Amino acid sequence: MVEAGLIDSTAAFLSGTAKKDQAKDATGGLLRQIGASGGIIMKDFTSILSLQRDQLRKILGAMREMYDGRWSRSIGTDGGRVLHWYGRAAMFAKVTNVIDQLHEASAALGERWIFYRFDDTDAYEKSRRALINSSTPGWRQDLRDLVSAFFMGMDLSFKSRNDSWPMTAAEQMRIISMGEVASRCRSAVLRDPYTKEILGVRETEGGTRITTELGQLWQGMRIIGVPEKLCWQLTGKVALDSMPKLRRVIVDSAIAKSGVDAGHICGVTGVSKGVVRRTIEDLEVHGVIESMDIGGKTYAFVTKWMEREMQKGWR
């Protein structure tokens, strides 16, 4: 496991510095450090999102290729070479909700990330815990040591190969329903950047990729001893958290109230009516929500398909 600093170019993954200019402590880049199998931790992914658009596009493009197990970088040093990496790389990143602003671009190119969003309702308890931790020196390192010892004790290093947790047919179907819901709810809708009109025919993301990720998450939790009920709760939360936050608020409200007024969503979130209505329209395009104008107000209801899949996945 490698902790990354600021990643401001693809050179951070595979360095192409000429041999004569390399420092004694040069690592060759993050992918050389983890080798054929490992993990990269990015404690502030928000700083990457603040880069210039071209830089960001190149970094996200490299990450998408790494997801598929290979990445190559062409360089001009030492007469011109191509650097290659092959393997499995897990990435763990902490980021603010600003990542939702890049959702359409990321989703249109093929989403790879899954999300776990922390509840922001109990600010008092978070502040209390922060005060307690600030008066306990070394708690971060103690926590690292505990987690490392736990995984070492179970022989769960990235270098080891473990059998996956067996899944029954019923469990597989439940994960598939979660994946189908998650993929539709996070699918991109291509809009004109100025008029906001929808461009082109609907292209809903297939559920294969996120279903596989959710299945691996569920199996991993079962292997380390997480109770089955909690495994399902957390897997279901990650599935729904992987859509943008505003979409999640609309879906949750439509389910809880058997239909919700767009004005109510505006009041809860502080988002303008135009943005809320476009977000409802995005979900409607992918068959998650259906809208209806009643008395001059726009109401959102979950579709029959959504009701059916939610019952199968979150029963």
Question: Where are these predicted regions, by residue range?
Answer:
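Alpha-helix C-caps/helix-loop-beta hinges
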Residues: 221, 257, 286-287
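Phosphate-sensing "switch" segment of ASCE/P-loop ATPases
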Residues: 74-77, 81-88, 98-236
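Short alpha-helical segments that sit at the start of domains
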Residues: 229-250
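Short, cationic-aromatic polyanion-contact patches
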Residues: 293-315
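Short amphipathic alpha-helical interaction segments
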Residues: 208-209, 270-285
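Conserved ASCE/P-loop NTPase catalytic core
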Residues: 1-124, 272, 284-285, 290-292
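Signal for well-folded cores of large energy- and translation-related assemblies
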Residues: 53, 64-71, 180-183, 187, ...
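Short amphipathic alpha-helical interface segments
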Residues: 243-269
